[in-house]
């Protein structure tokens, strides 16, 4: 599900079953990330798919990338893999004005 920043962040902060998932490259992550995010690089092909398959399907995933494109694709892929609750950050880090590390 695509969510705008305010709704995405509010939902995440109030979700006790939430996991932040950053699907950007290492170079992008080095420029700043949302605190406590789990990182799996979208461009790692089979390794990325394997990493997704090994995630806990009972969790709620708040997924982001640089622009919202890769994270949107990741949410669709996760849904196909049996994840029920995935939330894409529309605009990604390009439009993020929340906390970073």
Stretches found by the model and what they are:
Residues 1-19, 26-60, 66-101:
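Rhodanese-like catalytic fold shared by cysteine-dependent sulfurtransferases
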